[in-house]
């Protein structure tokens, strides 16, 4: 369980952000003079909703309904005194999707250290036997293939640094090529140095494009490709690529970013974003110890 001091810390960060976000959002809102609005605030604030969603993935729970009714409403009553019913809380989740996304992007993400890892992981929304009768994500989720076989759902594309901190993320349908997000400048914003990936990211055009933008894509060589010279440092970094697999594992097993009980797309996005936010608050993240020795030699890349 998360200690109350940590809950207070998360709430203070979320509340400060929500207040600033509301002020900035109000500047760009278009006023509707034809229709009168009550503008009555919700009983529970956006910051409290965000914190409750984040705590769900930090406590090892697997059923959100049980978590909210049996844990939040009973044991966290003193921290969240203005609680709403479970059905009302589910309705309010969609109202914090935009603040939650910007909160993660602008506050919680780590900084690039010059060594980054990229990978994608499938987010299955149903079993393969139920694909033809699945209706919740009809027109959104797609069939895809990963190292574990075929699946139906979405892909989560992650970039992390050597400290295990998430640098950026993107959700795509399951049939999108892993290399497509790397072709978007917004996904690679503030990413510099070496970017280690698996064989699914091999592509000469992609390598040249990234190299011109200050990013060196480091991948293994396929069996039917000509061998290429690679420095010892790059070979060692490729052996440490399991770091991002560990991050994916924590998102799925400690947090619960993947399950098949979603009833709407908004619920899926709220669950996924809160899982990523919860991981950013983990005190202990998987990391590798990287030390550079200055030998006085000049390296030309």
Predicted regions and their residues:
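Short alpha-helical elements
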Residues: 1-301
């Amino acid at each position: 369980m998360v200690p109350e001091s940590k809950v207070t810390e998360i709430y203070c960060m979320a509340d400060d952000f929500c207040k600033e976000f509301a002020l900035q959002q109000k500047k760009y809102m278009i006023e509707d003079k034809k229709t009168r609005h009550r503008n009555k605030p919700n009983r529970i604030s956006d910051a409290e909703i965000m914190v409750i969603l984040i705590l769900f993935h930090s406590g090892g729970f697997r059923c959100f309904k049980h978590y909210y009714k049996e844990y939040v409403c009973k044991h966290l009553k003193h921290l969240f005194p203005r609680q709403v019913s479970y059905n009302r809380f589910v309705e309010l989740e969609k109202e914090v999707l935009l603040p939650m996304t910007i909160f993660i992007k602008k506050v919680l993400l780590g900084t690039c250290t010059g060594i980054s890892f990229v990978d994608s992981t499938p987010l299955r929304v149903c079993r393969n036997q139920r694909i033809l009768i699945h209706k919740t994500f009809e027109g959104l989720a797609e069939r895809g293939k990963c190292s574990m076989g075929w699946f139906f759902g979405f892909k989560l594309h992650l970039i992390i640094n050597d400290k295990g901190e998430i640098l950026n993320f993107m959700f795509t349908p399951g049939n999108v090529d892993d290399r497509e997000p790397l072709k978007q400048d917004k996904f690679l914003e503030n990413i510099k140095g070496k970017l280690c990936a698996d064989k699914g990211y091999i592509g000469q055009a992609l390598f040249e494009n990234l190299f011109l933008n200050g990013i060196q894509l480091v991948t293994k060589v396929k069996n039917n490709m000509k061998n290429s010279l690679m420095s010892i440092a790059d070979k060692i970094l490729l052996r440490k690529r399991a770091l991002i697999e560990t991050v994916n594992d924590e998102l799925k097993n400690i947090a619960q970013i993947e399950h098949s009980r979603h009833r709407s797309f908004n619920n899926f996005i709220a669950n996924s974003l809160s899982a990523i936010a919860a991981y950013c608050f983990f005190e202990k993240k998987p990391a590798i110890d990287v030390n550079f020795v200055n030998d006085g030699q000049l390296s030309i890349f």
